[in-house]
């Protein structure tokens, strides 16, 4: 189906919302459903016009040939909304297709964050990495290559993600979470180099250096390419952020540490984290 085509009504319409990490979860969920039951798919993008943080449609950068619509483009009389909050367990694509057919539903609108490993395949991970890699352009390639070289030359590169600006509602990781995590890593790995990715780089550099760690503040001005840099590190200390969750997931990480609780306002899926990741309790305030 051609991009932005409205000639064919999609059978599945996934609401895109949130930042890069959330949208990657939504993309994987959409592909899981559409491929599992052979239904036409579109992404609904109404929410970005009102996003309080000015977040953009990232999926369109990664999947330029996908279909992106506003809800007004759908025949609302034949639509049904299915919210993640009413589901128990995973959504089976075959059962969903049967439900649409039996109830005469033209388009099923799916709303949620779908943060679950069971919706993500290794093929999708490879595809996301390739799509991000293909985005490199002249404006960002020099900085990207400089940081990539430093990361690849490091025997045990550590990506540390410190996120603060828009996370006061969900809870912010304590400084001691990062310090304890890095001390644990230093006790288990030799020849480490710390690469810090942060929306407050000066703050992050200051408290980590005061704790005795030498750091490299890292970033090339493009959040998607920074995600690729995080993915090229071998060890990860992530924030309670789906952005750095994906940085670790896209990597061949030998050690990933994440904060617990993940959020002060909601409980994550019990199948959101790989079993070989290490949780640090009491990490979020």
For every predicted segment, state its role.
Residues 23-34, 178-186:
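Histidine-anchored nucleotide/phosphate-binding helix
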């Amino acid at each position: 189906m051609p991009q932005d085509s409205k000639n064919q009504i999609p059978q599945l319409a996934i609401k895109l919302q949130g930042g890069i990490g959330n949208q990657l979860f939504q993309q994987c969920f959409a592909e899981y459903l559409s491929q599992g039951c052979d239904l036409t798919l579109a992404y609904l993008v109404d929410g970005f016009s009102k996003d309080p943080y000015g977040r953009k449609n990232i999926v369109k950068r990664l999947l330029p040939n996908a279909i992106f619509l506003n809800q007004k483009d759908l025949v609302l009389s034949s639509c049904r909304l299915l919210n993640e909050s009413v589901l128990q367990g995973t959504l089976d694509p075959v059962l969903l297709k049967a439900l649409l057919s039996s109830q005469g539903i033209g388009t099923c609108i799916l709303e949620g964050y779908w943060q679950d490993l069971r919706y993500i395949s290794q093929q999708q991970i490879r595809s996301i990495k390739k799509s991000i890699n293909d985005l490199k352009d002249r404006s960002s390639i020099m900085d990207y290559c400089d940081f990539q070289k430093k990361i690849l030359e490091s025997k045990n590169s550590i990506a540390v993600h410190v996120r603060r600006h828009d996370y006061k509602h969900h809870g912010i990781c304590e400084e001691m979470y990062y310090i304890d995590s890095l001390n644990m890593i230093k006790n288990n790995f030799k020849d480490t180099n710390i690469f810090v990715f942060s929306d407050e780089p000066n703050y992050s550099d200051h408290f980590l250096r005061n704790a005795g760690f030498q750091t490299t503040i890292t970033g090339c001005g493009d959040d998607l390419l920074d995600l690729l840099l995080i993915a090229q590190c071998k060890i990860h200390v992530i924030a309670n952020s789906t952005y750095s969750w994906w940085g670790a997931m896209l990597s061949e990480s030998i050690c990933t540490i994440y904060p617990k609780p993940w959020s002060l306002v909601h409980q994550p899926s019990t199948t959101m984290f790989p079993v070989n990741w290490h949780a640090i309790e009491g990490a979020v305030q």
